[in-house]
C-alpha cells in the first residue's frame, strides 16, 4: 500500500473504525492512466485503502490530485487501468455493462454538487424515482419516501418542484433520493460546493444524520475543510497517490478541522509551523458561523 502517513496524536482512534471492522469497500493497487507514450498522465498511482461499513470518509487534495478520478472509478463512471475495487465482496472492475447498471442502481447512492433533480418532477417523485426503477410497490414507495423525508426534514417540500425549493432544500431532497433505496455506499461529490455557509451546514448535518442514524457508509470528495470535519476519517491525495490519512477519533470537530487545515497548508506549500498556524487561525471562525 503506497501511503505516506503522519503519526496520529496519542490517544486518537477513529470513532467508527475499530481494530476489526466489516470492510465494505476495498480499493487495491488502483492505477488510472490517460494518454499514451510521451503524453501519459497517471491520475491514480497505486492507490489502496479500505472503508468500513458505517464509516463517513472524506477525500481531499489539491486540484488535479486525482480525487475526482478516484470517485469516478468507484462509481464506475470511469474504468481503472489496473487494480481492483471490491464493494461488499464484489469486484466491480470485472463487471460487464448490464451488471454495472444493476450495480449502480442497487448498491450506490449519489449526491452531486448541483443536486441534479429532475425539474419536471416534485420532491416526492424525485426521491421515489430510485424505488420506482427497482420496481417496488406503490405503498412501499410512499412509506419509504415519507420516512426518509421526515428524517431529513424535507417533508414540507415533497409536493414542490425543484424551482420552488431553496438550494439547501434541493440538496437535502437529493440526499433523500440517494439514501431511500438503502444503497451499500453513498458517494458525495462536492455536495456543498454550490451552497452558502448556512445551507452547507444544514446539508452536512443531514449527512451526519444519515451516517449516525441509518449507519450509511459515505465517501465524500470535498475541497472544504469545514465539510471534511464532519467525517470520521480523511484520505488526502496528492499527485495521484494516497499521501496521508487523518482520523478524527475522540477529537471534537473544531480540533479535527484545525488538523485538516494543517495538512492542507502543507499540501498547498504553506510549510512550517508559523504558516500552518496562521493558515488555521484565518479559517477557525468558519466553524462558528
Where are these regions (language model features)?
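ABC ATPase C-loop
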Residues: 154, 158, 178-179
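Conserved ABC ATPase signature
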Residues: 161-165, 169-171
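Conserved beta-strand-loop-alpha-helix hinge in the C-terminal portion
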Residues: 241-266
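Conserved signature/switch motifs of ABC ATPase nucleotide-binding domains
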Residues: 105, 160-163, 180-181
Amino acid at each position: 500500500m503506497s501511503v505516506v502517513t503522519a503519526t496520529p496524536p496519542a490517544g486518537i482512534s477513529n470513532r467508527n473504525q475499530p481494530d476489526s471492522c466489516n470492510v465494505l469497500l476495498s480499493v487495491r493497487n488502483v492505477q488510472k492512466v490517460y494518454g499514451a507514450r510521451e503524453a501519459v498522465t497517471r491520475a491514480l498511482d497505486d492507490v489502496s485503502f479500505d472503508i468500513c461499513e458505517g464509516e463517513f470518509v472524506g477525500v481531499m487534495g489539491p486540484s488535479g490530485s486525482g480525487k475526482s478520478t478516484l470517485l469516478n472509478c468507484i462509481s464506475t463512471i470511469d474504468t481503472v487501468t489496473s487494480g481492483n475495487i471490491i464493494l461488499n465482496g464484489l469486484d466491480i472492475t470485472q463487471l460487464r455493462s448490464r451488471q454495472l447498471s444493476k450495480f449502480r442502481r442497487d448498491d450506490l447512492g449519489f449526491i452531486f454538487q448541483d443536486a441534479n433533480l429532475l425539474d419536471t418532477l416534485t420532491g416526492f417523485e424525485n426521491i421515489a424515482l430510485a424505488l420506482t426503477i427497482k420496481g417496488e410497490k406503490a405503498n412501499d414507495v410512499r412509506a419509504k419516501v415519507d420516512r426518509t423525508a421526515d428524517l431529513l426534514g424535507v417533508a414540507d417540500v415533497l409536493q414542490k418542484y425543484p424551482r420552488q425549493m431553496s438550494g439547501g432544500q434541493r440538496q437535502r431532497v437529493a440526499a433523500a433520493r440517494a439514501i431511500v433505496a438503502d444503497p451499500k455506499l453513498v458517494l458525495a461529490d462536492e455536495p456543498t460546493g454550490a451552497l452558502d455557509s448556512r445551507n452547507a451546514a444544514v446539508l452536512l448535518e443531514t449527512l451526519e444524520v444519515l451516517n449516525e442514524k441509518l449507519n450509511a457508509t459515505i465517501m465524500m470528495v470535498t475541497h472544504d475543510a469545514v465539510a471534511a470535519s464532519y467525517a470520521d476519517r480523511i484520505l488526502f491525495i496528492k499527485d495521484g497517490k494516497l499521501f496521508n490519512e487523518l482520523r478524527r477519533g475522540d477529537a471534537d470537530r473544531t480540533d479535527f478541522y484545525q488538523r485538516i487545515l494543517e495538512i492542507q497548508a502543507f499540501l498547498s506549500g504553506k510549510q512550517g509551523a508559523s504558516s500552518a498556524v496562521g493558515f488555521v487561525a484565518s479559517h477557525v471562525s468558519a466553524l462558528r458561523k
